[in-house]
Amino acid sequence: MAIKKLVPASHPILTKKAQAVKTFDDSLKRLLQDLEDTMYAQEAAGLCAPQINQSLQVAIIDMEMEGLLQLVNPKIISQSNETITDLEGSITLPDVYGEVTRSKMIVVESYDVNGNKVELTAHEDVARMILHIIDQMNGIPFTERADRILTDKEVEAYFIND
């Protein structure tokens, strides 16, 4: 469909909770396709509608071998007490990385493009990406959850040791 322009990190849409999708129609299908096209053009792992200036609870995550995960009005149903601290970043904040502690396992309820309710259990990296993107749709950047922001030198070392 179309590669959309990303809003800058200072855009007010990124600080507000996105609106729930109420109508499951062709405009939602176009939005999901635009998110996919833009995500791949930006070489990102995930993207949500507010990042392309649409205040809707719609996101897409590239789960690599498992394919694309489309999230519409996602809600966390439960999450494990067991956590993992790992590096996070965002295309909205290029060159900014932080260590964020998140649940190791989550159960999320969402809807598919046709309005059917789906529930999925996600672990580790996928759980982290879902939690990150839901935060983003709720106006919470990963930097607010970060235990600490890393220096350029620390980020370099992190990728070398990974």
Swiss-Prot record:
Gene3D superfamilies: Peptide deformylase (3.90.45.10)
Matching NCBIfam families: pept_deformyl, PRK14595.1
Lineage: Bacteria, Bacillati, Bacillota, Bacilli, Bacillales
Protein name: Peptide deformylase-like
PANTHER family linked to this entry: PEPTIDE DEFORMYLASE
Entry's family note: Belongs to the polypeptide deformylase family.
GO biological process assignments: co-translational protein modification; translation
Gene Ontology MF, one: peptide deformylase activity
Any Pfam family the entry gives: Pep_deformylase
